[in-house]
Amino acid sequence: MRTQVIEGSIAALRRLYVFPDVAAKLETLLRDRARAGAYNRITSAKALADQLTNDLQSVSHDKHMRMRHSAKPVPDDPPLNAPPSDANKADMRRMARQLNAGFVKVERLDGNIGYLRLDYFLHGDDVGPRAAAAMTLLATTDALILDLRQNHGGDPATVALIVSYLYDAYAEVHINDIYDRPTDSTRQFWTLSALPGPRYADKPVYVLTSGQTFSGGEECAYDLQTLKRATLIGEVTGGGANAGGPVKVGTHFSLFVPTGRAVNPVTKTNWEGVGVKPDIATTAAQAFDTAYLQALRAQRKRITAQDAPHLSREIDQALRTLSRTP
């Protein structure tokens, strides 16, 4: 079992890992550790997976790279660039519906501030209608708090969809690139000119981040920050920018191998290993109140009691409530 998993991992890394030079270092590490008997006393399959994950990350510093053990045999890898099987499509549809395509909460807060919590950027037919529904509810709010504190990633195309809603239809904004090693190609992501829901252009956006924000969640935050389209509030994010997928390396083992890397068109780099640094640093727990306070204060300057008495009272009450929050 150990030899199969180690050799399978080495072969997968050689063939697919986005950084070939690091793949060579990982091969040396695994062979040296195996020769030294580092894995001989491990009897639990899960413990072996955990140890291999720790060893691989100690050199790669790639948080996406993880070994997993499955009680059921791992299916064979599909051919490169093969479309998803019917079973995979059904699984993705089921997950999207169970998780509401990642849309956890959409709300109009007192003071006419919009709030959207997104925990995943899932792919599938359910995403577009839910995004349109969310943006329809938020359309008449005056500022948006986009909560990515528990966002663990997903499809970069869905990130591009959400970012597109924050720009006018005529805007042609280059959001992100992803280089893919197996095909030696780069895929570009731009804002979309046609969307099914109302846009949220030219209004303030505040993005909440935490140390748990990862992968696609980080991309969204990084994209909006580098484009100067949003103010980031919260904690430094997890630091995972290399895209990929699971590869079978043993009968019951799969290794997530990052095959691509994000290349931001503005910075020409990404957030791998360092995370996305917020514009306003605070704890994850305080991020919402901090953003809400900023949005309300901006509203207070813009809205007068004479022009909008009901909204003005809402703003004042919300500010008083926040001032009493410990």
Kindly label every feature range from the protein language model.
Residues 153-204, 208, 212, 242-248, ...:
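Gly/Ser/Thr-rich loop/hinge elements
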Residues 100-128, 266-267:
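STAS-typified acidic loop motif
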Residues 124-142:
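A short, well-ordered alpha-helical element
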